[in-house]
């Protein structure tokens, strides 16, 4: 069973300066796929083998998983995958901002820790500031992929993403949930869930050309939907 960590604890609030692509990848100018909450990184390691012309970066808040995952990444054949420890909501914005234009071309959040209770809203991985940082880094047409096996986990992510108005579903993919994974390698969790014949809820978005809302405005509108009683008192 996956052990949760509280991202709001003081230890995880310390910002970390993540290395630039030049220090991470053998060919640093290749397009980057960023996987937020990559666990042991098995999906990314498989993608790196299949897609050597992409660089793949996973970030994970559980340090014991990162130690072994990045050891495997460093041993990969193509030098195009790394797994780093950080709190995505604290350390990723500056790293994405420093990238070359259109270097980040895909972001995925797959099976995040299920902080689905409303009082734990601020522990969820996809927060307004992080979503807008992703939207800033992605050029129009670039992808954001979300999936979970817990409906109460993915629905708030979908609500937040669509409230931002920065992303659209592909024209050919207007169904509520995608039937298939657009990535060619499933995560460990996805394999387990599908083996149990349980549902997986997936949504693929592409960055549109809309301007970004302010973080405070997006936070307020998200709170009004996700926790109306709290919104009335703030």
UniProtKB/Swiss-Prot annotation:
Belongs to the class I-like SAM-binding methyltransferase superfamily. TrmB family. It comes from the Bacteria. It comes from Synechococcus sp. (strain CC9605). HAMAP family: tRNA_methyltr_TrmB. Keywords: Methyltransferase, S-adenosyl-L-methionine, Transferase, tRNA processing. One of its GO terms (molecular function) is tRNA (guanine(46)-N7)-methyltransferase activity. Catalyzes the formation of N(7)-methylguanine at position 46 (m7G46) in tRNA. GO terms for cellular component: tRNA methyltransferase complex. It is an enzyme of class 2 (transferase). Pathway: tRNA modification; N(7)-methylguanine-tRNA biosynthesis. Substrate binds at residues 117, 149. S-adenosyl-L-methionine binds at residues 35, 60, 87, 113. PROSITE patterns: SAM_MT_TRMB (PS51625). Its EC number is 2.1.1.33. The gene is trmB. This is tRNA (guanine-N(7)-)-methyltransferase. The active site is at 113. It catalyses: guanosine(46) in tRNA + S-adenosyl-L-methionine = N(7)-methylguanosine(46) in tRNA + S-adenosyl-L-homocysteine. Pfam families: Methyltransf_4 (PF02390).
């Amino acid at each position: 069973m996956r052990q949760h960590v509280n991202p709001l604890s003081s230890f995880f609030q310390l910002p970390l300066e993540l290395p630039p692509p030049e220090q991470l990848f053998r060919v640093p100018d290749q397009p980057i796929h960023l996987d937020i909450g990559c666990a042991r990184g098995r999906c990314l390691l498989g993608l790196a083998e299949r897609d050597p012309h992409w660089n793949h970066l996973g970030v994970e808040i559980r340090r014991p998983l990162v130690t072994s995952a990045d050891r495997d990444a460093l041993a990969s054949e193509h030098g195009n995958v790394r797994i780093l420890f950080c709190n995505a909501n604290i350390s990723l914005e500056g790293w994405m901002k420093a990238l070359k234009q259109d270097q980040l071309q895909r972001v995925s959040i797959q099976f995040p820790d299920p902080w689905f209770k409303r009082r734990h809203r601020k522990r969820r991985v996809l927060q307004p500031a992080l979503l807008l940082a992703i939207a800033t880094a992605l050029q129009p047409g670039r992808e954001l992929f979300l999936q979970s096996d817990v409906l109460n986990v993915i629905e708030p992510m979908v609500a937040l993403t669509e409230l931002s108005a920065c992303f659209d579903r592909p024209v050919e993919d207007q169904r509520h949930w995608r039937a298939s994974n657009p990535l060619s390698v499933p995560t460990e969790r996805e394999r387990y869930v599908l083996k149990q014949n349980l549902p997986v809820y997936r949504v693929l978005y592409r960055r549109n050309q809309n301007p970004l809302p302010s973080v405070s405005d997006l936070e307020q509108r998200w709170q009004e939907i996700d926790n109306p009683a709290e919104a009335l008192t703030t």
